[in-house]
């Protein structure tokens, strides 16, 4: 684990996910029931219309004030909120405890966090047509993303709205890759306030996989991060995934592991 960079990587990811929930909360009438609030300096959020661990998280200082995290988990349990624990992957076991209360690790939500300095990245050359999403191509990005991640039809409007930045911060970037004038892949990037460019979601149409589009989107976003003055690039991937291999070829290295935990069965609200 990289003790110096790990907090910055986690902060960048929190900021990225918070921004997506803020986008939902700012839709007129807040139809998705999105809420963002804070535990000290740490953003927390949940979305009534979605049980996704991406959008329902409690953050906080687990060393200095673990009780605050525990209280917020209990107070928002109806939203299936989770909290991330970080460390060496081997230490992130199936069970953890906060002040004696049992937490259980979510299956399929243990990832590696990657990072590299902007001046050590390895940009691969490609000839693909990658551009910033426009009003027209943004909807196509959302379609590709929903298809790639098997988003249920009833959740597709929510998913698309979470990427549609409502504020004028300009921190959330969406890119699309075209082949023969058709959007076949896309990716997001968030320019965090701490100088870290967080490489968010990337997806490719099933019929277009294996052609190098994912690697090209990594390279493009890293190049864009440099142009925006970022000092670091960070990303998340499963340990055995092609995403991990593509990130490492681009110069990113494993910083630490992250696993998501929620309250164990049988906890009492009393």
Cite the ranges covered by each PLM segment.
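A short helix-loop-beta-strand connector motif used in the catalytic cores of GNAT acetyltransferases and
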Residues: 28-37, 78-81, 165-175, 185
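Conserved beta-hairpin
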Residues: 36-39, 90, 96-101, 171-185
